[in-house]
Amino acid sequence: TLDGFQAYGGSKNAVVRWMRKLAPVWAKDGVRINAVAPGTTQTPLLQAGLDDPLWGDAIRNFPVPLGGFADPQQIASALAFFLGEESSFCTGSVLFVDGGTDALMRPDKF
């Protein structure tokens, strides 16, 4: 069986693969589909994790090259970009709003 981390990572990959497969199909009808991949974001759920004696240190030490955690408004701004005219030529794209974590941790080869 999958543990929570494997299931979480697998679900993120599934969403991206689904979105990228649909992008060229929907583009024929003028429909764009993109994704925002948020990093660790300041939410009540994150705060509960930070307060947890078992998980708090691991969360605080999670590698974020820019440091700290995202503010929810930063994630909302990325979503607003994809909804606006500025992204009218974007489809099948993933915008990472994670302080550089993906750039740091993504392997060069899969």
Each language-model region and where it sits:
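A glycine/serine/threonine-rich, flexible loop-to-helix segment
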Residues: 1, 41-64, 104-110
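Catalytic loop of short-chain dehydrogenase/reductase
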Residues: 1-28, 40
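Short-chain dehydrogenase/reductase
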Residues: 19-20, 76-79, 83
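Short, small/polar-rich loop/turn modules that mediate ligand/substrate recognition or access, typified
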Residues: 27, 32, 90-92
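Conserved SDR Rossmann-fold cofactor-binding beta-strand/turn motif
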Residues: 32-42, 83, 96-98
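A conserved structural motif in NAD(P)-dependent oxidoreductases
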Residues: 63-75, 86
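Short C-terminal tail/terminal secondary-structure segment
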Residues: 91-110
